[in-house]
A protein has these predicted regions:
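Acidic, surface-exposed loops and disordered segments
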Residues: 1-182
Length: 182
């Protein structure tokens, strides 16, 4: 992985447009974590080896996981200092445009954005999925009736969005999922 610090205000504004997140230009620090197989390719080639694995799904998943772990470590470090953080998965709304803006070469892909700064307010914690939905024992288990099992969670998420001051929307978790899968 590699980390790109976004310090150019115009670039922050363009990323905010891609992500549909108007607060991004005001973030104290903006980072984009990228899957970086280019560096490994250049190293392999410099050593005279053929870089054949950079396009494999396994290598991509491993490198993507590394980028996400690095982002989480930055969150832990920032929060230990009293700073606030916001993951920005929405930077991937237009992956091609973001890659062009960041001048990402072949074998480098955006993974996640991260805004870090001193919070103006103490935000309400976003509701988490119920434990029985995300934690299983021994084997994968489908939800028997997803809409019924997530009914209470939908109500919590709806209330969470309704009470927000910024980026207010009336939405439910299951509706968000359906929209992204359509």
């Amino acid at each position: 992985y590699s980390i790109i610090s976004i310090t150019d205000q115009k670039l922050k504004e363009e990323i905010a447009e891609i992500a549909n997140q108007p607060y991004i230009p005001n973030a104290g620090h903006l980072f984009v974590f990228v899957v970086d197989q280019r560096r490994n390719t250049l190293i392999a080639e410099a050593k005279g080896a053929e870089a054949l694995v950079q396009g494999s799904p396994e290598r991509f998943i491993s490198a993507f996981s590394d980028a996400m772990i690095a982002a989480q470590n930055m969150v832990v470090a920032a929060e230990s200092l009293g700073m606030g953080t916001v993951y920005l998965g929405s930077i991937l709304n237009d992956n091609a445009k973001l890659s062009e803006l960041l001048k990402l070469p072949k074998y480098v892909y955006p993974a996640v954005g991260l805004a870090v700064g001193w919070p103006d307010q103490e935000p309400q914690l976003k509701p988490r999925l119920p434990r029985h939905v995300i934690h299983m024992e021994n084997y994968y288990q489908d939800l028997e009736n997803p809409l019924e099992e997530l009914k209470d969670y939908d109500a919590e998420v709806h209330e969470y969005y309704d009470l927000r001051d910024l980026n207010k929307r009336v939405d439910e978790f299951t509706t968000q999922i359906a929209k992204t899968m359509d």
